[in-house]
């Protein structure tokens, strides 16, 4: 007589037939072995350390090597974002555009999305987040890299030190640094992340000789700095600058920032850098941090102003640059009552020409002209930057993102600052907005062109029409992600006006 019941036989057969659970992916990298997850055909690793925690005695030091670990380190969750104030949704910036996890000085981590199959090396896309050098993090849902990775690429996102932890200078810090400078720790973090990628990305199926470094807003400026930094030479082959400060970001010299650091030391009530390193991050921010620290021209990491056409490129290669139509709705505001004052203050050298071209007889006209003036200024700055940076080995391709984000007031916010990022990365589903087929079509087309650029250096090799050609001083060379009835970009008269303004030292970028 059989000892097996019909039920037990059925259960046993199901157990035999059931496929084995997918084995979690592992990789042996600098420091040791890490374990990630498998999700929808991708290997995903989150919270990978690319440098030692910059805490204690390592606060305000160049990135240091990771301390090796034993066993297998889990890399399944995002690490903390770098030290910053708590982010809260505002305006069009819903929770998908805000870092919501922990914040800590221990933050030098990166994340990787890679196709499960790695028979052929994939192009690599390393994305550097924005946030005015004060906020942001790689854990933001809008920066999820899975969508682009599914198109056969390896996507990397990184954290870098922010605010006074990333851009603090002091004479004693400069003296103790092997480079002899201080104040650009956030830039050094990005360089270290690129170095890590070059050394390790093949373990994830990525091609270290096809690395595109991309950044948005503050991240775009970092990419601009990387282009001229000798320390980043050979670490990437292509670059993308989204909503960057081309011809626009003011930069201080090292000596000026060191003086600011000396004042911070006094405010903290300590006598030396060791004392400043001993106080907590919260106390430092409360007592000693000041102003709006930005990258500086230090003569070593950033040898000269990246926006100066005389500054040579340390890394030559194809570049994509672009702006969103309505950047100013968030960053500039509606100065209706002060239109003339704005023009006469910011554009003194060409104020009469601007006032003659842009209508401002009524509040409504002035409001429209403020928005239009900001758009024209940025387009002109982008084209002039492209003219200065284009070379035989480094063609520049320009775009204008003019698609209105779903559920957003087209007049008040429109194609706002940062709106393009989830379209490029394929992270639309993380937003609170309701996207339709047209949005997915735009995302697919942008990804197709970006992937062609990542693979070949030429986004014009994508199948999409119209053909995207290299930028020139002709506004028609700009690829526009815009509705068919979109108004024309700036004309020749306006372009010449802004060119004259830039020649006299005027700033045309985002800030």
Regions found by a protein language model. Name each.
Residues 6-17:
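Bacterial N-terminal signal peptides
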Residues 20-184, 435-446, 454-463, 484-485, ...:
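Non-catalytic accessory segments of hydrolases
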Residues 83-86, 380-511:
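Mobile gating loops/cap/lid regions near enzyme active sites that modulate substrate access
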Residues 95-96, 195, 199, 233, ...:
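Substrate-access "cap/lid" subdomains that shape
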Residues 107, 179-202, 256-259:
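Alpha/beta-hydrolase active-site loop
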Residues 123, 204-216:
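Alpha/beta-hydrolase fold nucleophile elbow
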Residues 130, 185-189, 217-220:
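Active-site loop->helix "elbow" adjoining a glycine-rich segment at hydrolase catalytic centers
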Residues 220-232:
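Short glycine-enriched nucleophile-adjacent loop
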């Amino acid at each position: 007589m059989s000892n097996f019941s019909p039920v037990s036989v059925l259960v046993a057969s199901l157990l035999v037939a059931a496929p084995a659970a997918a084995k979690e992916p592992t990789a042996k990298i600098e420091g040791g072995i890490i374990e990630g997850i498998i999700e929808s055909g991708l290997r995903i690793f989150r919270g990978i350390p690319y440098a030692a925690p910059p805490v204690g005695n390592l606060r305000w030091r160049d990135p240091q090597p990771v301390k090796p670990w034993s066993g297998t380190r889990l890399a399944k969750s995002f690490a903390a974002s770098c030290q910053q104030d708590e982010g809260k949704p505002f305006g069009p910036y819903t929770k998908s555009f805000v870092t919501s996890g922990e914040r800590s000085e221990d933050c030098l981590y990166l994340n990787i999305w890679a196709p499960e199959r790695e028979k052929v090396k994939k192009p690599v896309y390393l994305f550097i987040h924005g946030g005015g050098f004060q906020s942001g993090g790689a854990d933001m849902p809008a920066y999820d890299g899975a969508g682009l990775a599914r198109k056969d690429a390896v996507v990397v996102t990184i954290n870098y030190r922010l605010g006074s932890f990333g851009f603090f200078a002091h004479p004693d810090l400069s003296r103790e640094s092997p480079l002899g400078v201080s104040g650009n720790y956030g830039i050094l973090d990005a360089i270290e992340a690129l170095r890590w990628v070059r050394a390790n990305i093949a373990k994830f199926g990525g091609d270290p000789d096809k690395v595109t470094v991309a950044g948005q807003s503050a991240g775009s400026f970092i990419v601009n700095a990387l282009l001229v930094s000798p320390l980043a030479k050979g670490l990437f082959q292509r670059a993308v600058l989204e909503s960057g400060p081309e011809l626009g970001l003011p930069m201080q010299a090292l000596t000026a920032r060191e003086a600011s650091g000396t004042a911070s030391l006094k405010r903290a009530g300590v006598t030396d850098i060791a004392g400043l390193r001993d106080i907590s991050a919260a106390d430092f921010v409360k007592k000693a941090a000041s102003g709006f620290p930005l990258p500086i021209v230090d003569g070593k990491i950033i040898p000269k102003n990246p926006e100066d056409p005389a500054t040579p490129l340390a890394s030559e290669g194809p570049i994509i640059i672009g702006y969103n139509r309505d950047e100013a709705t968030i960053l500039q505001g509606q100065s209706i009552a002060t239109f003339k004052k704005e023009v006469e203050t910011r554009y003194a050298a060409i104020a009469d020409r601007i006032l003659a071209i842009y209508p401002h007889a009524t509040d409504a006209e002035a409001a429209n002209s403020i928005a239009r003036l900001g758009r024209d200024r940025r387009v002109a700055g982008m084209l002039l930057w492209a003219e200065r940076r284009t070379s035989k080995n480094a063609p520049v391709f320009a775009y204008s993102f003019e698609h209105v984000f779903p559920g957003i007031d087209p007049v008040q916010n429109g194609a706002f600052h940062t709106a393009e990022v989830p379209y490029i990365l394929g992270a639309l589903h993380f937003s609170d907005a309701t996207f339709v087929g047209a949005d997915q079509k735009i995302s697919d087309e942008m990804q197709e062109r970006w992937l062609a650029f990542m693979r070949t250096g030429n986004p014009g090799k994508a199948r999409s029409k119209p053909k995207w050609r290299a930028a020139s001083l002709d506004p028609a060379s700009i690829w526009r992600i815009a509705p068919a009835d979109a108004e024309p970009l700036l004309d020749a008269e306006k372009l010449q006006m802004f060119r004259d303004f830039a020649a006299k030292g005027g700033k045309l970028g985002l800030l």
